[in-house]
Swiss-Prot record:
HAMAP family: RuBisCO_S_bact. Keywords: Calvin cycle, Carbon dioxide fixation, Chloroplast, Photorespiration, Photosynthesis, Plastid. One of its GO terms (cellular component) is chloroplast. This is Ribulose bisphosphate carboxylase small subunit. RuBisCO catalyzes two reactions: the carboxylation of D-ribulose 1,5-bisphosphate, the primary event in carbon dioxide fixation, as well as the oxidative fragmentation of the pentose substrate in the photorespiration process. Both reactions occur simultaneously and in competition at the same active site. Although the small subunit is not catalytic it is essential for maximal activity. It comes from Detonula confervacea (Marine diatom). PANTHER family: RIBULOSE BISPHOSPHATE CARBOXYLASE SMALL CHAIN 1, CHLOROPLASTIC, RIBULOSE BISPHOSPHATE CARBOXYLASE SMALL SUBUNIT. GO terms for biological process: reductive pentose-phosphate cycle. Transmembrane segments: none annotated. It is found in: Plastid, Chloroplast. The gene is rbcS. Belongs to the RuBisCO small chain family. The keyword Plastid applies. Heterohexadecamer of 8 large and 8 small subunits. SUPFAM superfamilies: RuBisCO, small subunit.
Amino acid sequence: MRLTQGCFSFLPDLTDEQIEKQVACAMSRGLAMNVEWTDDPHPRNNYWELWGLPLFDIKDPATVMFELNEARKSCAAGYIRMNAFDASYGTESCVMSFITNRPVSEPGFYLDRTEGVGRQIVYSIKSYSVQANPEGSRY
């Protein structure tokens, strides 16, 4: 099952050239880039691990691509995404995010049903990879 989070998630994976163009476009608008990774693909997992430091003062897309490639070397078996951060007054938030790296196999999710008090049924989504493997060895 293909994880769909962020921009371009329903399109085929972006090539490095396309990623670099997106980074250049974001930087031309004054956005700061950063790289994040995770091995927990749950849809509500918004807090991925930050790779290195945020690239606030970087003006060259090649530097961002270098950091992305370094993250790919270390975290090749997990998910890696790029974020564009708008630090302008009134926004101060992530305005663009897209996945740049995926594991070879994405086993997907299952629906867990639990009965509570008064026949209340609670559903939760759980990842097959998280259930089967401890953190750090999921992919």
